Amino acid sequence: AVTQFKGNPVLLNLWASWCPPCRREMPVMQAAQQQHDEVHFVFANQAETSDVIQHYLQTENLQLDHVLLDTHTELAQWVQSRGLPTTLFIDAEGNMQSYRMGELSAASLASHLQALQSSQSEIAH
């Protein structure tokens, strides 16, 4: 899924609507997504149905780009995530720059995104 975004940095967020920290960080993620056009935000829901996801997004008035269904939690297994939310920061070359398990505050997310973009500008020079 992430390979289609190669050439741009990617934030990959593993989440579920039943997860309180995931729910709290979603408005923060949406705001960051709107502020960072150069980063592709990908939201991989873990083991919920599309109906549940759509209902949650509509109820919370969230407009997220690239919401994926990971019905068998394959991504969580691949990154060996022990909890949700889990966020991966992937550079334009497809390499994971950092990994964070747990809720991200706006300040922490901004710091991770700045580091991701710094690695991007180093690649460009």
Regions found by a protein language model. Name each.
Residues A1-V10:
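A short beta-strand-turn-helix
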Residues Y56-Q63, D70-S121, H125:
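Thiol/disulfide oxidoreductase modules built on the thioredoxin-like
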Residues R23-E60, T71-Q77:
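Structural microenvironment flanking redox-active thiols in thiol-disulfide oxidoreductases
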Residues N13-W18:
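Aromatic-flanked redox-active Cys/Sec active sites in thiol-based oxidoreductases
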Residues L11-L12, F41, T87:
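Hydrophobic beta-strand anchors of alpha/beta hydrolase catalytic cores
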Residues V39, D65-H66:
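Short, conserved active-site loop motifs that form the nucleotide-linked donor/cofactor pocket
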Residues T3, P20, Q30, Q97:
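Nucleotide phosphate-binding site architecture
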